[in-house]
């Protein structure tokens, strides 16, 4: 009878121990926190022991099972703590990498916003959209400029083609025959010779025009008067013709007069040249005679120079 009661108490303790172990295994699935006081070091060598109260009276096998369970849970906690540290370090590294990526993206957006002239909004999508539109507009302007340049080049080539095809277009039939048949060289050499011939002809025309006799100067009035001590005023009026006043000035320069001041006035188809001359021992009559002698070579036949009043 006593043996049966002792066996019943042993089975009761066995089932209580099983429930306790299952409860401890469920609790060990969660990570321990800093405030967790379920486990603490009580031995000098740093070994961990469970602070949970053990059953008051258990058999030897049940106590060994509880002790083994406590050691297993301690090992599980130590391993779980190491895995949590690795996960936290990886998460911090990912956060830093994401921050660096966003910082670089913002810097590029700021640089893009600084070069685009028209920004409608300040958000990222609007900045990128405005930049794309600006680039497309620049590309369209580039294509337009290239088309204009090509049109100008084609027009210049078309205008230069007739001159290159016929370098004798500005010459007569005789000159073209002479330069085309007696000099059957390359087209560039013929073009150079044609240009040389044209320049020679233009120079000869200029020389002929210069050698042609100039029309006579029509002197309408000559006045010489005294305005002060050793100062005379010489006034010559002539008709406005080609090189008339230039020839009068050259004639007066040959007299080597000491001119104080001079001016030329154009009035009603006439040119009037007035000089203020400084003299030493010469009166107005002598000055008039000297000026008349210098201008007599310029006047036309029948000019009233000799009948002018003084």
Curated annotation (Swiss-Prot):
InterPro entries according to UniProt: ACT-like_dom_sf, bHLH-TF_ACT-like_plant, bHLH_dom, HLH_DNA-bd_sf, TF_AMS/ICE1/BHLH6-like
Subcellular location: Cytoplasm; Nucleus
GO MF: DNA-binding transcription factor activity; protein homodimerization activity; transcription cis-regulatory region binding
Chain spans, region Basic motif: 89-102
Segments of skewed composition (Low complexity): 41-57
Region (Helix-loop-helix motif) location: 103-138
Induction and repression of expression: Induced by jasmonate. Induced by wounding and drought stress in leaves. Induced by phosphate starvation in shoots.
Keywords linked to the UniProt accession: Cytoplasm, DNA-binding, Jasmonic acid signaling pathway, Nucleus, Stress response, Transcription, Transcription regulation
Domain bHLH: 89-138
Tissue expression profile of the protein: Expressed in spikelets, leaf mesophyll cells, root tip and root epidermis cells.
GO annotation (BP), single: phosphate ion homeostasis
Gene3D superfamilies in the cross-refs: Helix-loop-helix DNA-binding domain
Chain spans, region Disordered: 26-57, 174-194
Example of a GO cellular component annotation carried by this entry: cytoplasm
Pfam families registered for this protein in UniProt: bHLH-TF_ACT-like_plant (PF22754), HLH (PF00010)
Miscellaneous comment in the UniProt entry for this protein: Overexpression of BHLH6 promotes shoot and root phosphate accumulation, and root hair growth and acid phosphatase activity under phosphate sufficiency.
Biological role: Transcription factor involved in phosphate starvation response. Acts as a positive regulator of phosphate homeostasis and phosphate signaling by antagonizing SPX4. Transcription factor involved jasmonate signaling. Regulates shoot growth inhibition in response to jasmonate. May play a role as transcriptional activator in the regulation of jasmonate-mediated stress-inducible gene expression. Possesses transactivation activity in vivo.
Subunit field text: Forms homodimers. Interacts with SPX4.
Record family assignment: Belongs to the bHLH protein family.
Protein's UniProt name: Transcription factor BHLH6
